[in-house]
Amino acid sequence: MVAGKLYTYPENFRAFKALIAAQYSGAKLEIAKSFVFGETNKSDAFLKSFPLGKVPAFESADGHCIAESNAIAYYVANETLRGSSDLEKAQIIQWMTFADTEILPASCTWVFPVLGIMQFNKQATARAKEDIDKALQALDDHLLTRTYLVGERITLADIVVTCTLLHLYQHVLDEAFRKSYVNTNRWFITLINQKQVKAVIGDFKLCEKAGEFDPKKYAEFQAAIGSGEKKKTEKAPKAVKAKPEKKEVPKKEQEEPADAAEEALAAEPKSKDPFDEMPKGTFNMDDFKRFYSNNEETKSIPYFWEKFDKENYSIWYSEYKYQDELAKVYMSCNLITGMFQRIEKMRKQAFASVCVFGEDNDSSISGIWVWRGQDLAFKLSPDWQIDYESYDWKKLDPDAQETKDLVTQYFTWTGTDKQGRKFNQGKIFK
């Protein structure tokens, strides 16, 4: 009897394939309790056995290592699940491949933004829905006269396709969308109610209302994953502010051969800068950014007010809406960094100083922004609208003393927030 250790994180639908197969075959699978995704699978010991660092990964009791979820499921299955003839074996492989090529990519494109782990793209999601429709219709036609995908019993084909459909049926395939696929629904419900399947996935609830992309959830996820990245040098609170280092223009990196995705992006027409429709005015954003980077604030702030063109540029105050949910300060900083990365194309015509005030579990995020135009700039492009709704925005009067005080505070990284929390860290968008 097959026995061994399965490395995976909780609720991994890919690992479900092997775990369900083991329920049918009697294979003894032990889930590695000490496994920590992002740490264990990056360790030298793990990479020695599984060079790509992917999970699920399986190590048999006699020391053999197997990667890739379908291969692991096949290994721990019995002959009934694998097919009773060469034809059935081939048909099972066909449906396993169908799941990986026709369902999984489109499922990820549609569902992952809903879960907050991938950025939403309207066109890509529309294509994904069309692809899922085609895949479900193919399944529905095949199951019109069949109880299972291959033969008269449950096989790996049913297990693998069911596991690949779990996220869709859980998060986005509401009743209105799935009602056209009567045979597929019947088959799916039959599978998830098998005792061997329920032993792994538990009680499964079909989607009632299709999930939607939530910018706040996405921003929080980006902050969480960004916490493991190497921190960039940041300014720290100080009595005497050190002169900022001069920002050098990086040399062009050595070019590498572009992959298919890069080639496709390169082939797309260049997008037009939304700011081009607005008057340029007299304020030279690049000039101010250079002056700010190379001079103390005692010089750069007066320089800002001397050059600022209030007729063609505006100043805004931003405040993060969900401050009671902020935890670690470094995660708050990652929220800011993530937003800056996602609005990269605004950088040429905008400047911002965004600060974290307070300490762990008692902090706030707020900032001062300057950009060309008199309206909220994020509405100019769908690409800039991922994060801004997580903030309250207030347009400031450039002639008001309150505005001048705020600009000084945020450009010098000093003072407190509205609740009296002291400045902790700041980031500059320039």
Curated annotation (Swiss-Prot):
Region: Disordered; residue ranges are 232-278
Record's compositionally biased regions (Basic and acidic residues) = 232-255, 269-278
List, alphabetically, the InterPro entries matched.
EF-GSTs, EF1B_G_C, EF1B_G_C_sf, Glutathione-S-Trfase_C-like, Glutathione-S-Trfase_C_sf, Glutathione_S-Trfase, Glutathione_S-Trfase_N, GST_C
Q: Which UniProt keywords apply?
A: Elongation factor, Protein biosynthesis
Top-rank taxon? Eukaryota
Segments forming domain EF-1-gamma C-terminal: 271-430
Q: Which residues form the GST N-terminal domain?
A: 2-84
* Coiled-coil zones: none
GST C-terminal domain boundaries = 85-213
Single GO MF descriptor = translation elongation factor activity
Q: How does it assemble?
A: EF-1 is composed of four subunits: alpha, beta, delta, and gamma.
Q: Function of this protein?
A: Probably plays a role in anchoring the complex to other cellular components.
Q: Mind telling me what this protein is named?
A: Elongation factor 1-gamma
Q: What is the lineage of its organism?
A: Eukaryota, Metazoa, Ecdysozoa, Arthropoda, Crustacea
